[in-house]
Swiss-Prot record:
Residues 288-303 have a biased composition (Basic and acidic residues). PANTHER family: ADENYLOSUCCINATE SYNTHETASE (PTHR11846:SF0). It comes from Ruegeria sp. (strain TM1040). Binds 1 Mg(2+) ion per subunit. Plays an important role in the de novo pathway of purine nucleotide biosynthesis. Catalyzes the first committed step in the biosynthesis of AMP from IMP. This is Adenylosuccinate synthetase. Its cofactor is Mg(2+).
Length: 437
């Protein structure tokens, strides 16, 4: 049976939630392998809206096993609130349907406090645009070998020792930022209280995943955010704190890379970004605010963050960036989403290269100062007046919409496997089945 990795191929918000839900119907296991609750997934099923941040998208589908892997950083309090919310919507979540890797690092309240304090202290131009939810500091503690992990909740003595080690590092940091010391006893009490709620879901996920693989079960690996936010291959330092590309799927759950059969990249038919950082095709007017086309994309596409509510920056499709992502993630095919948002544009533009200091480039350079100076080189295409919303076959698409899709394929050097024409899961055109053996 084929195992599929789903990754965002831009800066996140590409519509992964819908595609994962669409694919999860035929998967047996759905696993989150990186990120935290800073990335939101919006699912629309039978007109009911589910907004998930920590939970895998597969939880809304009965009879599936959802997994939170060790590559994730997990806020246990947020997770339990999210479980309560989803249960209130009629979704059953039990230790039989949700497993959390025992070696998953936990996000502590002091991680979010540190995140926000640093962002507030940062001077203009150096802010990252973090969600302030503690993701970065939690990953820092993981790499610094002072993280508190799910398994630590099972033993009081171990837990208190882990807390003491973390505080030895964090209290001096807080002092330098003018933040009060952490209340050690209160934190320990909070952790002991939440332990009884989290531990029933704890499991040796690496073992379970390998058993499922050997049994021929179909596994769907669900990434958060987008590859252009990858800590190594994104627009550093305006990135997230984990690896987002497909290679992380294996290490993020404890399964071998030879277990991955297909990588599906989720690509929006235009480009958006939340927060700071370079964005060559961003549509801005002379006043630095979105121009008419940028406003139109944002309004039609409902471009507001699931997690923060922040308005997303909008721009034309950037073929160079997506082509890079197809290479770094080994993408076999893409799911092109939100094609319907482009309905009604007389002219569409696609970025086919950059001009940097008089030279033409076909990729975005690594250095941040060069990224900021890159100017897009556009190719124009004729738009279409007809509606593509809700289309479920190529025959329902306008000729110019098909031309646009085909040109995207040519420029990114990767085929379209799925085409999404609305937030509804069934408004999807299947070209290549990622789960096909």
């Amino acid at each position: 049976m084929a195992n599929v990795v789903v990754v965002g191929a831009q800066w996140g918000d590409e519509g992964k939630g819908k595609i994962v839900d669409w694919l999860s119907e035929r998967a047996d296991v759905i696993a989150r392998f990186q990120g935290g609750h800073n990335a939101g997934h919006t699912l629309v099923i039978d007109k009911k809206v589910y907004k998930l941040h920590a939970l895998p998208s597969g939880v809304v589908r009965g009879g599936k096993l959802s997994v939170i892997g060790n590559g994730v950083v997990l806020d246990p309090w947020h997770l339990m609130k999210e479980i309560e919310t989803v249960r209130a919507q009629g979704v059953e979540i039990t230790p039989e349907t949700l497993m959390i890797a025992e070696n998953t690092p936990l996000i502590m309240p002091f991680h979010g406090e540190l995140d926000r304090a640093r962002e507030e202290a940062a001077s203009k131009g150096t802010k990252i645009g973090t969600t302030g939810r503690g993701i970065g500091p939690a990953y820092e503690d993981k790499v610094g070998r002072r993280a508190i992990r799910v398994a630590d909740l099972a033993d009081d003595a171990t837990l208190e020792a882990r807390v003491d080690r973390a505080l030895q590092h964090h209290d001096p940091l807080r002092k330098g930022l003018g933040v009060e010391p952490i209340d050690r006893d209160a934190l320990v009490a909070q952790l002991k209280e939440i332990a009884s709620e989290i531990l029933p879901f704890a499991a040796p996920v690496w073992k379970v995943m390998n058993e499922k693989r050997k049994a021929g079960k179909r596994i769907l690996f669900e990434g958060a955010q987008g590859a252009l936010l990858d800590i190594d291959f994104g627009t550093y330092p305006f990135v997230t704190s984990s690896n987002v590309i497909a290679g992380q799927a294996a290490t993020g759950v404890g399964i071998g890379p030879n277990s991955i059969d297909y990588v599906l990249g989720i690509v929006k038919a235009y480009t958006t970004r939340v927060g700071e950082g370079p964005f060559p095709t961003e549509l801005l007017g002379a006043d630095g605010k979105p121009d008419a086309d940028g406003e139109r994309l944002g309004t039609r596409g409902h471009e507001f963050g699931t997690t923060t509510g922040r308005q997303r920056r909008c721009g034309w499709f950037d073929a160079c960036l997506v082509r890079q992502t197809c290479a770094t993630s080994g993408i076999n095919g893409i799911s092109l989403t939100k094609l319907d948002v482009l309905d009604g544009f007389e002219t569409l533009k696609i970025c086919v290269g950059y001009e940097l200091d008089g030279e033409r480039l076909d990729y975005l350079p690594t250095a941040a100062d060069q990224q900021a100076r890159c100017k897009p080189i556009y190719e124009e295409m004729e738009g279409w007046s007809e509606s593509t919303e809700g289309a479920r076959s190529w025959a329902e698409l306008p000729a110019n919409a098909i031309k646009y899709v085909r040109r995207v394929e040519e420029l990114i050097q990767c085929p379209v496997a799925l085409l999404s024409t609305s937030p509804e899961r069934d408004d999807t055109i299947l070209v290549t089945d990622p789960f096909a053996d």
